Structure formats: C-alpha cells, structure tokens
Regions:
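Short, basic and Ser/Thr-rich N-terminal targeting/leader segments
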Residues: 19-20, 71, 120
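N-terminal targeting leaders only when they are immediately followed by extended low-complexity/repeat-rich tracts
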Residues: 16, 50-53, 65-68, 129, ...
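Conserved N-terminal alpha-helix of the aminotransferase class I/II PLP-enzyme fold
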Residues: 34-86, 108-116
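N-terminal start-of-domain structural block
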Residues: 1, 56, 60, 190, ...
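N-terminal "arm"/small-domain region of PLP-dependent enzymes with the aminotransferase-like
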Residues: 1-56, 64
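Conserved PLP-enzyme active-site core in the AAT-like
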Residues: 7-13, 75-288
Length: 288
C-alpha cells in the first residue's frame, strides 16, 4: 500500500459486518478461561492482553498503522512524546552508560538527557548536528550505548544528516534513534537513511488537531543486538523478572526492542496511551 492508503487503511482490516472504525476497547483487564492461559501471557509465551497498563487492542492497532507508515517491524504507543523518548533511551541505557545526542533537540528532551538521566547515572555528550564526521566521532566513549537526534529539530529547524549520524553510530556498534515528529513518515522515513529506532510525539502533526497527547516508538528491525551483546545486556542476557528469557534470542532483531520496552518499562512506569486517545489519534492519522 502507498502511504496515503496506509493513513486510512493501515493497521486494521475489518471483517464482514465488523466496525469500519477501530473499536475503542475501554477495559482495564481481559478475561481468560483458565489460569494456564493467563500464565502464558505473563511468561511472554503467547500473544494477547491482560492489563491495559502494558498493552491494549485499540492502542496496538494504531501503533501498527504508524509502524507500517514508517516501514518498521514493531511499534508501541506511549502517553506522550517525552515518554516515548525516555523509553527508547532507557531501554538501552543503565547507570554508567553514555549517550551522544544532537545539541539542537527539543528543550524538554535536552533536559531529559542532560539533567534527569544524569541523576540515573547516564551521561551525555551533545554535538552540533552540522559537525564534521571527525567531530562526531570524537564524541563517542567506550561506554556509549546510543546516538539520538531529531529529523528536523524542534524549534531550531536544523535538519539532521541521518546518514552521517547512522554511519558514526554503527561504526561504534550502537543504534541511532531519530525523533521524526516534525516531518512524520509522510515526508521522511528515517529507516531509509540508516536510523534504527524512530520516535514520535504524536501530539503534533500525527494528531493534527491539538486534541490528544501521545507518543510512539517504532523499531526498524535491522540492528543486530546479539552481535553487540556486550553493550546491551538488557536485551542479550536473561531477564530475571521474566523467568530468564533473553529478548534478543526469543524475539530476534525484529521484535526484541519493543517487547522489552513493553514488558519491562511499560510494566514498571505505566506510561500507556489511553484507548480513547489512540482512537482520536487514528482519526488524525487518516488525514495526515
């Protein structure tokens, strides 16, 4: 499907006699016949829903549409764009790690990285997005885990050279996260230029009506986590809170990142978008 069609039809294909618009599943919990069925969900052995703090069918339909628009392999919604950026970064970083980021990013995200995440033991080096390749390379440290930038900076409007930043990130064995809020995938798809993870504040142009807060994270499904297992223990070593599963082994390049962000971060922080907000976001996407 072309992008115009995805805006309207993506993420949801109603069957005969089913609603034309995506249904609003305004429910906190979901019923299962046996405790064994529920147990498989808790152990990540089966797909499904049990608590809307982690996942909700309405939200997943809209996330799937955004995933299709970006050309990714997996996606999730969050309660805001700030939550999306925090989840994307914290899904890879822990105390003692380092981030390389564009210096012209949105002020809220700049403070998230430079102030709040610093309190969590995560440091950062900010670089001019127009810097030379040599200057960019010099910003990396042995403990660098991710590179972050915005396709078009908010509000500076500086355009990120995604290919340059992706090349540098990959040379150091780390992924590039690009906040694609301003262009949206209608005007730019960062995965086509080398980005590995894309985030959005859907509050802006995706909603398009100033009606609902929201965020999204999309995985391009190409970064090989296991090839850099020493850098990403959260993805490549057993998770004791889920009976020792290893996300990169169980879900592969295509699904490990979003599964971990959902199973760990959404479980613990609960920054889930509401079904009603997701429904209204979908209306905005239809006219994107």
């Amino acid at each position: 499907m072309n992008r115009d069609t995805i805006c309207v039809q993506g993420g949801y294909t109603p069957g005969n006699g089913e609603p034309r618009q995506i249904p609003i599943i305004q429910s906190t919990t979901f019923k299962y016949a046996t405790s064994e069925d529920m147990g498989k969900l808790f152990d990540l052995e089966a797909d499904g829903y049990f608590y809307s703090r982690l996942q909700n069918p309405t939200c997943d339909l809209v996330a799937k549409k955004i995933c299709e628009l970006e050309g990714g392999t997996a996606a999730m919604l969050t309660s805001s764009g700030q939550a999306a950026n925090f989840f994307a970064l914290f899904n890879l970083c822990e105390a003692g790690d380092h981030i390389v980021a564009s210096s012209t990013i949105y002020g809220g995200t700049f403070n998230l990285i430079s102030v709040t995440m610093k309190k969590m033991g995560i440091t950062a080096t900010f670089v001019d997005p127009l810097c030379s390749e040599e200057e960019l390379d010099a910003a990396f440290q042995p403990n660098t885990k991710v590179v972050f930038g915005e396709t078009i900076a908010n509000p500076a409007l500086t355009v990120l050279d995604i290919e340059k930043f992706a090349k540098a990130a990959h040379a150091h064995g780390v992924p590039l996260i690009v906040d694609n809020t301003f262009p949206t995938p209608v005007n730019c798809r960062p995965f086509e230029w080398g980005a590995d993870i894309v985030t959005h504040s859907t509050t802006k142009y995706m909603d398009g009506h100033g009606a609902v807060l929201g965020g999204a994270i999309v995985d391009g499904g190409k970064f090989d986590w296991m090839a850099h297992a020493d850098k990403f223990p959260g993805l490549c070593t057993p998770d004791e809170s889920y009976h020792g599963i290893t996300y990169a082994e169980r879900f592969g390049k295509e699904g490990a990142f979003i599964t971990k962000a959902t199973a760990q971060l959404m479980r613990d922080f609960g920054s889930m978008q509401s079904p009603m907000n997701a429904y209204m976001l979908n209306l905005g996407l239809e006219s994107l």
